[in-house]
């Protein structure tokens, strides 16, 4: 499942997981989308085939990214557009307690090292005994810079030509 915006992505993920209980379902959500739709985590029919990654930067970072019109307002964008400091202001306890109290396995990461310590557990192909939430704490400056780097990557002409040939002739 997938889409754009905050309207029901977590609920859609849960519905898909109920329809196919033998498959593992992954969802990646920003904090605004997650908090908007988090009540579905308490659905009594949720199974152990759900994995949710929550990117918690404490605001709607897309409104602060270098390529969004809201970025022109700088810090004012946080207050009036990006909903900064909402839902516990990046609390390290709020989602942890909510998820654990509902029976989810809770994992967290605030650095690359911490992420590397938990990502294997989160992405295991094995069905686990509980659904999972992995909350990753980030900041909007790093996210915007990463987006800018990704959007401005250049591919060498040789690499493009090589890929075209592979597409036409197929892999070895």
Spans of model-derived segments:
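Thiamine diphosphate
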Residues: 1-172
């Amino acid at each position: 499942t997938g889409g754009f915006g905050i309207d029901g992505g977590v609920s859609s993920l849960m519905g898909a997981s109920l329809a196919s209980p033998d498959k593992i379902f992954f969802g990646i959500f920003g904090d605004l989308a997650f908090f908007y739709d988090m009540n579905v985590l308490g659905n009594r029919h949720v199974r152990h085939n759900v994995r949710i990654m929550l990117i918690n930067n404490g605001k709607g970072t897309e409104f602060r990214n270098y390529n969004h019109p809201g970025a022109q307002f700088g810090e004012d964008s946080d207050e009036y557009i990006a909903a900064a400091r909402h839902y516990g202001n990046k609390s390290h306890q709020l989602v942890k307690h909510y998820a654990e109290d509902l029976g989810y396995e809770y994992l967290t990461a605030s650095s690359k090292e911490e992420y590397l310590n938990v990502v294997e557990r989160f992405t295991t192909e094995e069905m686990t005994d509980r659904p999972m939430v992995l909350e990753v704490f980030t900041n909007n400056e790093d996210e915007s810079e990463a987006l800018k780097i990704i959007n401005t990557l250049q591919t060498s002409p040789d690499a493009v030509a090589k890929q075209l040939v592979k597409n036409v002739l197929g892999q070895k």
